[in-house]
Amino acid sequence: MVWQGPQRRLLGSLNGTSPATPHFELAANQTGPRCLEVSIPNGLFLSLGLVSVVENVLVVAAIAKNRNLHSPMYYFIGCLAVSDLLVSVTNVLETAVMLLVEAGALAAQAAVVQQLDDIIDVLICGSMVSSLCFLGAIAVDRYLSIFYALRYHSIVTLPRAWRAISAIWVASVLSSTLFIAYYNHTAVLLCLVSFFVAMLVLMAVLYVHMLARARQHARGIARLRKRQHSVHQGFGLKGAATLTILLGIFFLCWGPFFLHLSLMVLCPQHPICGCVFQNFNLFLTLIICNSIIDPFIYAFRSQELRKTLQEVVLCSW
């Protein structure tokens, strides 16, 4: 990965400089403090990646199979699944190639490995950018469906949805190519971090506004039924819990990776920041975990999609 600076995973494997058997340890810097390093076993990383691949393939297959799901909202969810699928596939592919090179089962020259690493990095970066974009697109779509309910179908049409989807994919490919080509430039890392913060703020503002509108609607219903306190309190707690889970998972899974990028700009040589850099594979694992969780948050809550998913699974057997 280019995000590790000179410690590229595939090239490190080729040169025999990859880390030893992963474990949970305290690593001591020569000039700094003892660092808590959480190394992820390759078997666990590959297993999580494969689980994510299966989940997101099923989501895409279910949406493709059921015509009732051929709407802008489900297309955005399907594209999020494709992005998460690419995140998992590219990381699993990189790890698998790394293990093959380490075991001597795959003989390759440094130049070939360099090109392969660049291609994989472009795919990983592009899939991450598109995943964040589609998370934002889903938030915007839900916002429009609540605040512009009567005009929603005239605002969010299929042609507009497809144009937005196409623009996201094109922008993701172009930006990832530029990011990988100029990853040594501070501006590139700052752009990536700023993009993450912008998506986080966008999602937080939209979902908080939606929660406020939903609570206002619940109060109106409660007044009509003369059960204002109990209904409003119960709905408020449920809505706040849902919002906390949604934004919390997003921040916990993506935040450490972008903290890593931020520290690469702010303190690349500081010993304490070096402790954070040592846990890069943990941050990638958290992103894979996000790819596993996303279908449960955005896709599997739909009864129609769950029914179609069951049909897809039964047909595959």
UniProtKB/Swiss-Prot annotation:
Keywords: Cell membrane, G-protein coupled receptor, Glycoprotein, Lipoprotein, Membrane, Palmitate, Receptor, Transducer, Transmembrane, Transmembrane helix. One of its GO terms (molecular function) is melanocyte-stimulating hormone receptor activity. Glycans are attached at N15, N29. It is a multi-pass membrane protein. The chain crosses the membrane at residues 38-63, 73-93, 119-140, 164-183, 192-211, 241-266, 280-300. InterPro entries: GPCR_Rhodpsn, GPCR_Rhodpsn_7TM, Melcrt_ACTH_rcpt, MSH_rcpt. One of its GO terms (cellular component) is plasma membrane. PROSITE patterns: G_PROTEIN_RECEP_F1_1, G_PROTEIN_RECEP_F1_2. It is found in: Cell membrane. Residues 64-72, 141-163, 212-240, 301-317 are cytoplasmic. One of its GO terms (biological process) is regulation of metabolic process. Residues 1-37, 94-118, 184-191, 267-279 are extracellular. Belongs to the G-protein coupled receptor 1 family. Interacts with MGRN1, but does not undergo MGRN1-mediated ubiquitination; this interaction competes with GNAS-binding and thus inhibits agonist-induced cAMP production. Interacts with OPN3; the interaction results in a decrease in MC1R-mediated cAMP signaling and ultimately a decrease in melanin production in melanocytes. Receptor for MSH (alpha, beta and gamma) and ACTH. The activity of this receptor is mediated by G proteins which activate adenylate cyclase. Mediates melanogenesis, the production of eumelanin (black/brown) and phaeomelanin (red/yellow), via regulation of cAMP signaling in melanocytes. This is Melanocyte-stimulating hormone receptor. It comes from Canis lupus familiaris (Dog).
